[in-house]
Amino acid sequence: MANTYLTRTQVAGNRQIFTQSIWFKLTSTADQVFISSYNDANNYNCFFLESGNQVLQVLWKKSGSNAALLNTTRKFRDTSAWYHVVLAVDTTQGTAANRIKLYVNGVQETSFSTATYPNQNESIEVNDNNTNQRIGALNTDTFFQGVASYVAQIDGTQELP
């Protein structure tokens, strides 16, 4: 399963407000992409486990620049544990830190080694009918290694766990 993933063609939807959720258990602490929307190398978004530091990372690329980048300070390297991660997004919020909320096992992550939030009203690749959404991969080179369950995306609302 090291090079397999699910893909779906997205339909036009709300590109500013949405929630993504996944339950997962790691089998490796290498780079792990959970959910991504990929247009090209300069325009994509994903959230994943970054292997160098074993931190969760939210990364949005727009025209080759980081439109958003969050790296947790907390480490995620327990291959025996199940994690529930919720990414709650609302770029219409006036306060930058409210535009992306990341929860792990019901607790909001508030400590980040890097915290670059998107501009207010930023639209990203999620719910864009010109991009492919992938569960378990970024493009065709970084794959999820583990077990995933109950992957969900909710359009138009920033839900809490």
Place the predicted regions along the sequence by residue.
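Extracellular glycan-recognition modules
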Residues: 2-59, 93-96, 157-161
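Extended recognition patches within non-cytosolic domains
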Residues: 2-3, 94-96, 101, 110-117, ...
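Beta-strand-rich interaction surfaces with strong enrichment in secreted/lumenal proteins
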Residues: 8-10, 71-77, 122-123
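Short tryptophan-centered beta-strand motifs in secreted/extracellular beta-sheet-rich domains
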Residues: 20-22, 80-91, 102
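Surface-exposed loop/edge segments in extracytoplasmic proteins
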Residues: 43-45, 65-72, 107-113
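Short, aromatic/His-centered strand-loop micro-motif at the edge of beta-sheets
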Residues: 59-84
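Short, solvent-exposed beta-strand-to-loop segments that form ligand-recognition rims
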Residues: 104-131
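Extracellular glycan-interaction patches encoded by glycine-rich segments
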Residues: 125-149
